[in-house]
């Protein structure tokens, strides 16, 4: 769908160039490259992915620096983190989700969550969490084995959810 849209935009730009060229017959020939068009939704998705990747790496750096094992990615945890970040961004408020639902859906024996808003990067949000006793305890908890991070932006403000877990045996 995105490829078709880009192709459509590119073809539209070419058609506009042809119409302009035909209407200016006799005028000196000039060409201008069309600026690439990137849909806002694509830019936001890429921005969220970069934010999430940055926060994931920063979290594991903090863990390793303190003798903890790095956490692996949790697909189910990522789904719930993204869902929570999206809800917070839509409401433009910060709140925790029901971790019992997350634990059940992801088959976890242990779960935790950090949430935040207003930090410009994944590194900065992890730095803030590390400065808070409760959030730092979640990040450094030895019971966790996997993590998911979701980030969404609303009106220029990032909303972030970090969900931790350990699979049930």
Regions found by a protein language model. Name each.
Residues 2-14, 18-169:
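Functional surface patches built around histidine and acidic residues
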């Amino acid at each position: 769908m995105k490829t078709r849209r880009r192709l459509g935009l590119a073809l539209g730009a070419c058609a506009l160039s042809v119409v302009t060229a035909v209407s200016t017959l006799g005028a000196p020939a000039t060409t201008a490259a069309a600026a690439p068009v990137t849909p806002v939704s694509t830019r936001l998705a890429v921005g969220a992915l970069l934010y999430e990747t940055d926060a994931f790496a920063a979290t594991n750096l903090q863990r390793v620096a303190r003798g903890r094992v790095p956490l692996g990615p949790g697909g189910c945890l990522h789904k719930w983190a993204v869902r929570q970040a999206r809800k917070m961004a839509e409401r433009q408020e910060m709140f925790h989700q029901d971790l019992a639902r997350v634990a059940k859906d992801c088959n976890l024996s242990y779960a935790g969550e950090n949430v935040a808003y207003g930090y410009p990067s994944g590194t900065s949000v992890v730095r803030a969490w590390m400065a808070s006793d409760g959030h730092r305890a979640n990040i450094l908890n030895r019971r966790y084995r996997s993590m998911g991070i979701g980030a969404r932006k609303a009106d220029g403000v990032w909303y972030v959810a970090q969900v931790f877990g350990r699979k049930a045996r």
